[in-house]
């Protein structure tokens, strides 16, 4: 993480360095990103860079933390549902958060996609059991709760499903934005209230129908889907 000297900088200068770094990492991997490009675009001396950060990886980790922080900020802005969420409604809310992040912070979203592409999460370790799991560990807990609450069928391979949901969560947002622009013929507004946009909600609902048809415990849900 950055050195204390970085956090003592005036906010305007600190934000400038962060913005320049985000632009650099949006277009380049950690290995190919240039310290020279960052210091030149930020208007700082190269020696100052190393007063603020240990190395380029230190700055990169700081940008990844910014991504997490911005997502946490977005969670508080989306309206809470009136009732408790079932497994699939909870997943829909998570996807809305990802989409809001893509819309409001496109460069940070691009950094995150590049990071995920270059560092694919093919497995994770369960902190309680030590068991190696496929994909993002967050979805294993999510799916286990779904099975426990009878939202998800017991025959579902949660290891495989967790991996698939991880892939969906990382790459769905840019597709949805592009799809909305194609369908409407105009750019999506940055301040769009995604929770109220009917076209977007229709697309998300269709995705939920697909997932429910494959994983829901209630066989009637699958029957209804395939009869459409």
Q: Residue spans of the language-model regions?
A:
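C-terminal peripheral helix-coil segments that are non-catalytic and often amphipathic
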Residues: 141-149, 167, 171-228
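Generic hydrophobic, amphipathic alpha-helix propensity
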Residues: 13-21, 38, 63-71, 139
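Amphipathic alpha-helical packing segments from all-alpha helical-bundle domains
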Residues: 69-72, 89, 121-151, 159-163, ...
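N-terminal intrinsically disordered/low-complexity leader segments
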Residues: 1-12, 219-228
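Amphipathic alpha-helical segments used for helix-helix packing
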Residues: 90, 101-123, 177-187
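Amphipathic alpha-helical linker/stalk segments
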Residues: 63-93, 110-113, 145
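Helix-turn-helix
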Residues: 16, 27-58, 62
């Amino acid at each position: 993480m950055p050195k204390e000297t970085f956090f003592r900088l005036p906010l305007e200068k600190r934000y400038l360095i962060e913005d320049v770094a985000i632009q650099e990492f949006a277009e380049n991997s950690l290995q190919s990103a240039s310290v020279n490009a960052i210091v030149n675009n930020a208007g700082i001396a190269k020696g100052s860079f190393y007063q603020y950060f240990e190395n380029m990886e230190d700055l990169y980790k700081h940008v990844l933390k910014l991504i997490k922080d911005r997502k946490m900020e977005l969670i508080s802005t989306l309206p809470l549902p009136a009732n408790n969420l079932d497994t699939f409604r909870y997943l829909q809310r998570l996807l809305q958060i990802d989409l809001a992040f893509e819309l409001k912070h496109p460069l940070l979203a691009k950094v995150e996609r590049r990071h995920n592409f270059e560092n694919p999460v093919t497995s994770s370790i369960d902190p309680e059991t030590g068991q190696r799991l496929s994909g993002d560990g967050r979805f294993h807990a999510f799916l286990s709760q779904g099975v426990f609450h009878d939202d998800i069928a017991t025959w579902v391979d949660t290891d495989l499903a967790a991996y698939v949901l991880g892939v969906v969560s990382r790459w769905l947002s840019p597709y949805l934005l592009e799809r909305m622009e194609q369908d409407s013929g105009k750019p999506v507004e940055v301040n769009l209230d995604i929770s109220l946009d009917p076209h977007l909600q229709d697309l998300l609902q269709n995705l939920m129908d697909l997932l429910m048809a494959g994983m829901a415990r209630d066989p009637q849900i699958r029957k209804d889907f395939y009869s459409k």
